[in-house]
Amino acid sequence: SDPNEMGDNLPTVNLGTGRTVLAVASSDYHDCAILDDKSVKCWGDGGTGVRNDLMPGGDLILGNGPGEMGDNLPAVNLGTGRTAKAIAVGGTSSCAILDNGSVKCWGGNSSGQLGQGNIISRGDTAEAGHEMGDGLPAVNLGKGRKAKAIATNGETVCAILDNGALKCWGDNAYGQLGLGATGNREIGRAHV
């Protein structure tokens, strides 16, 4: 990029009037931020968890047109009363650790990276509304388990649990789940 476009010449990302950012995660296709009110806003292509009703046909790309950012950019619906503690994004999927320690993932799901026991994408279509919020199940981390940290490359997700254990799910073509074998884990529960 042109050095004259950086520094004071580089505009800030407008995420809403008076909003500040606590955490941010970035992928090749989209970005997500946890705001000072613990809500999540995502923009870019895929993994945003919201439909862009500002464009004809509900374009899923947010942030590339006038009037799409700031107060017009909706927060991701994580469920009634739920807020985010941590966010991870990769490719066209996103995962958040919620205030209660549960994990919810949305977006593309070609390798089972959403942890729902299938390869059905969620929150990435014009019908995203019913797939999000209370309609988006939390990932089954095990009885009573909560997540402390989360990371994803877009196809594989790993979470550090409250007991210090690590669970990973999704793409395993190269053994990246650490299970001593290959083959994706598309089942509804995470594996160690």
Predicted regions and their residues:
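Short glycine/serine- and acidic-residue-enriched loop/turn motifs that recur at repeat junctions
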Residues: S1-M6, K41-G70, G107-M132, G170-R189
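Thr-biased low-complexity repeat/linker tracts and other Thr-enriched repetitive architectures
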Residues: S1-M6, T12, T17-T20, L35-S39, ...
